[in-house]
Amino acid sequence: MIIWLAELLQPYFSFFRLFEYLSFRAILSVLTALGLSLWMGPRLIKRLQLLQIGQVVRNEGPESHFSKRGTPTMGGVMILAAISITILLWANLSNPYVWAVLAVLMGYGAVGFVDDYRKVVRKNTDGLIARWKYFWQSAIALVVAFALYAYGKDTAATQLVVPFFKDVMPQLGLMYIVLTYFVIVGTSNAVNLTDGLDGLAIMPTVLVAAGFAVIAWATGNVNFSQYLHIPYLPHASELVVVCTAIVGAGLGFLWFNTYPAQVFMGDVGSLALGGALGTIAVLVRQELVLVIMGGVFVMETLSVILQVGSYKLRGQRIFRMAPIHHHYELKGWPEPRVIVRFWIISMVLVLIGLATLKVR
């Protein structure tokens, strides 16, 4: 929005030329999203407390979590509002990639909102029925996948970039739709599974978004994309503003979500953020790098799959409790130790993911 206004005013005020620079808008994006989150946080927390919208804690969970019962939840509304407002302000709204991410962010946010509403307002601990949750997640992902395929059919936008290999970029064809579906839905649910401790999900989300900001910038720059042997996608550079909005909003939320948390993001936040990360990975053609940079999310998801599979096949559990962060809690690790160590792992994995751009 601002970029359109700047274009109109440039002939009269040279200052507005600054808004042409992606780096300048990226900085403003971080600061705007951060400021909005910090401003909305206390007000939203107070409102949630008045409405008695508090976290539901299952009795079979770790005993240390019982004290979290009643902590305000659905704080993801604040994150989504900060991200959306920031994107509308600082991004180039004629860019289709921006709207693709916004569509998934708000669509998955709506699914998460209904799920949270049923849990905390209707007092239904199961929330939205699983089949309906997956139906709407799938519907949104497929609509976006078909739209992106139609837009970039048989171009670099539908190639698969394989890390560590310079010239291995097969054209996916219709398999692009299948891959896009699984990346968006899978990442959304992986972040949702990770969101079990104070700040555990939001910091890796911030780190991965920051990593994708770098990748989006390189992918959208003709010189750097050629130098790094990755597809040149001119629309991708605008995703830098989207990624930095996620970083700013996430850091602002972490201010209130750090241990001991004053508010939880709920499914409205985790499903939406995961879906947005998956969409960004698809748009910059780095789905496999997402597996590396989002390794904490992958680890949490695999722990659940292995736990369920082992119990059904052998009648035995691999972990004391899944997702795996609960396993370490039950081993006696204090919650802050689990959280910070997972953050460190995430930071290392993001750096490894960025290194794949050069190591080919």
Swiss-Prot record:
Recorded topology in the membrane: Multi-pass membrane protein
Cofactor: Mg(2+)
Reactions catalysed, as given in the entry: UDP-N-acetyl-alpha-D-muramoyl-L-alanyl-gamma-D-glutamyl-meso-2,6-diaminopimeloyl-D-alanyl-D-alanine + di-trans,octa-cis-undecaprenyl phosphate = di-trans,octa-cis-undecaprenyl diphospho-N-acetyl-alpha-D-muramoyl-L-alanyl-D-glutamyl-meso-2,6-diaminopimeloyl-D-alanyl-D-alanine + UMP
Biological processes, Gene Ontology terms: cell division; cell wall organization; peptidoglycan biosynthetic process; regulation of cell shape
Predominant place of localization: membrane
Molecular functions (GO terms): metal ion binding; phospho-N-acetylmuramoyl-pentapeptide-transferase activity; UDP-N-acetylmuramoyl-L-alanyl-D-glutamyl-meso-2,6-diaminopimelyl-D-alanyl-D-alanine:undecaprenyl-phosphate transferase activity
Pathway membership, UniProt: Cell wall biogenesis; peptidoglycan biosynthesis
Keywords associated with the record: Cell cycle, Cell division, Cell inner membrane, Cell membrane, Cell shape, Cell wall biogenesis/degradation, Magnesium, Membrane, Metal-binding, Peptidoglycan synthesis, Transferase, Transmembrane, Transmembrane helix
Residue spans crossing the bilayer: 21-41, 73-93, 94-114, 132-152, 168-188, 199-219, 236-256, 263-283, 288-308, 338-358
UniProt EC number: 2.7.8.13
Cysteine disulfide partners in this protein: none
Alphabetical list of InterPro entries matching this protein: Glycosyl_transferase_4, PNAcMuramoyl-5peptid_Trfase, PNAcMuramoyl-5peptid_Trfase_CS
One annotated Gene Ontology cellular component of this protein: plasma membrane
Subcellular compartments: Cell inner membrane
Known function: Catalyzes the initial step of the lipid cycle reactions in the biosynthesis of the cell wall peptidoglycan: transfers peptidoglycan precursor phospho-MurNAc-pentapeptide from UDP-MurNAc-pentapeptide onto the lipid carrier undecaprenyl phosphate, yielding undecaprenyl-pyrophosphoryl-MurNAc-pentapeptide, known as lipid I.
Family of this protein: Belongs to the glycosyltransferase 4 family. MraY subfamily.
Name assigned to this protein: Phospho-N-acetylmuramoyl-pentapeptide-transferase
Organism, as annotated: Vibrio vulnificus (strain YJ016)
Gene transcribed to yield this protein: mraY
